[in-house]
Amino acid sequence: MKNSKISFLCLLLLAPARLLAQAEMPGTDPWTLGSVDPAALMVQRIGIDLERRLAEAPGKRTYATREEANSLTKKKARLAEILGVVDPRTGTGPVEVVSPLGSGQIEANGFSIHAVRWPVLPRLDGEGLLLEPKVPSGQTAIVLGDADELPEALIGLIPGSETKAARLRGLAQSGTRVFVVAMIDRRDENSGSRVIGRFTNQPHREFVYRMAYEMGRHVIGYEIQRVLGLVDALVRQDEKQTISLWGWGEGGVVALPAAALDVRIAKVGLSGSFSPRERVWSEPIYRNVWNYVSEFGDAGTATLLGNRGLVVSNEAGPKIDGPPKPKSGRSGAAPGKLGAYEETKVLAQFQLAMQKRIPEAKNAEWVFGATDGVVWEQMFGPTPQVKSEPTMSQPLDLVAKAYRRHDRLMDQLCDHVQLLWNRGDRTRMGAFNGNALAQSGNWDRETQILRQDFHNQVIGNLGQPEGVPTKRARSRKIYDTPDFVGWEVEMDLPVAPGVFAKGVFLMPKGIKKGEKRPVVVCQHGLEGRPHDVANPLQKTNYYNSFAAELARKGYIVFAPQNPYIGQDLFRVLQRKANPIGLSLFSYITAQHRVVLDWLKTLPEVDSSRLAFYGLSYGGKTAMRVPAILKDYCLSICSADFNEWIGKNVAREPWGNYTSYMYTGEYEMVEFNLGNTFNYAEMAWLIAPRPFMVERGHNDGVGIDPMVAWEYAKIREVYGRLKIPDNTEIEFFLGGHEILGMGTFAFLKKHLKYPE
């Protein structure tokens, strides 16, 4: 919490000299971190480890050329999965002409212009503009501009993209049907809800991304669906036409995987988008795709084109300095910038794709050029550049109408995600089949596969360490009270060289030789430190020094330092982790495993009684880590338990609580969590071990009905397992804080201490 640094400073000032003696704990080596801030160093080291893994990822990637014959099909299915292209399209309906352009006919030399719409998913359409040649050649081009380019600008109806407009008009004049698809842009006017009167400065693409990512969808994937829905409609009309796809900037980010997934697209051209993706974490968050760098990268995606054409232009893409500036009532957007890619790196990525493509594609036409002018003819053949302006039969306010179209398309995406959220409970139950498992009598065994899926597919597994720690834990004494002694302890993390686990260890005095006591691992929250929970000299805000209080009662306590500290310095860790299939909790889980292994070596510790108790972000840890690490014999979630998926995706949250759609905590979303594990399902992975929720009525993290709704599903499963006493919830009149009443009784009951 915010007062953590001040609290620790007061501790140093007020404590007698003997508390600050540097004596290490028996069985450990002396403290080596000196006066450096361990939490800041931890975050820094994790960042270094992630950048190393990102750099190594392309070299460890597998490609279709090195796998079995049907690997293209498997890889396409996997690419569709991580991009959220998983909903069956309607498969019916034509491209239809709609107003406003239909009511104000626009004619040009050799072609006419129409506003068009086509079906994609139920209650979700694609829209754009069509340049219809008067003498068609049988060629069709689908064009995606950069996110901030209106289709009207791309064809020259309004200023802004004159060079591109000249090329597209020339293409239409030469007989090619040109469809310019409307994209979700980077403004923020519609990023929020007029119903509840809350808004953010998140770009529209980020606003859609946040809610969609949690439900296993993606703004990129939705736009791929719109492209492929258009292809569906065109092919129904004429199976023999040749369809090409071109994308500029953000449009290129969509065009490459769209073409990779659909063989009906004969050729794809990309401008200002094709690049290495190892630094995607520094770009806008709506480009974040789970495991994309590990499994694909742009080179790997290009290989899925097989023997179809690819044209890459290294013309500079969009330059974006960040999200819209925060202003009153609008804040919370994630940082991220876009700029030109180095030509040598783009060319190297192109050459990697050339090298890795399947043998049958060796003769496919793949072209790289420095600018659009160099490669445009390679893509479309000789075409004129038509700079004359089309004429309109009546004036139209095209910009205002274009923005209304944009908001309509964006609202459809948001509505689709809200529908997925409403259906998510049924989806998760179908996968988990909790009631049937409860009746099977093999709960622990049957849930092991789900536990592995949670670790590997949702949290991200760092894997097994390459060896045991080569160094012992290091420590220094920081507390010496009448009831207990405290040390800061640091230990290596073998699975991530250079990264360490660290915390405060409290050992009660008076433990008899041969006596073994339970341990309670007490976890701080956001921007917190172990001293917030373990400080014996003052009653800390929110935490009420609950770790120190437990130590006074005779429990052995360990208070870990978790790496969610430093604002964007830690949030960017999630950005670096996701592209290689990891998350912040990948490291937290590994750190807790090391801590537990160390605790089990201590002669005073009963390794069968290792409990977890965390507040706020520590409550998030209480849901995730014990679900994976079965060495924890019980878990208590305080000031965090929720209908977690709704808290992340609700555009119009009910009740007065904090929804992550409207905060700067952009690291909260976890890919496809909404279809796999809400808090009930996480608690089911903890079962049959004891599990408890501590909930203050005034805690703004949620509202009581939401908390009770989600908890009821847990209580039902424990009841069906015939262990209803193993789970409890305590509501109390208070806020975001540790109460330490029912929870302390819960610890005493299940740890059987004090006797």
What role is predicted for each listed range?
Residues 1-8:
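Bacterial N-terminal signal peptides that target proteins for export
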Residues 9, 19-20:
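Cleavable N-terminal signal peptides
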Residues 22-126, 136, 207-223, 228-232, ...:
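Alpha/beta-hydrolase-fold serine-hydrolase catalytic core, especially in secreted/extracellular enzymes
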Residues 138-139, 174-177, 240-242, 263-267, ...:
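Loop/turn elements at helix/coil->beta-strand transitions in domains of secreted/extracellular proteins
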Residues 138-235, 273-286, 512-601, 648-656:
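Cap/lid segment of the alpha/beta-hydrolase catalytic domain
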Residues 182, 271-272, 313, 561, ...:
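Alpha/beta-hydrolase-fold catalytic nucleophile elbow
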Residues 229-304, 597-665, 671-672:
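Primarily recognizes the serine-hydrolase "nucleophile elbow" in alpha/beta-hydrolase
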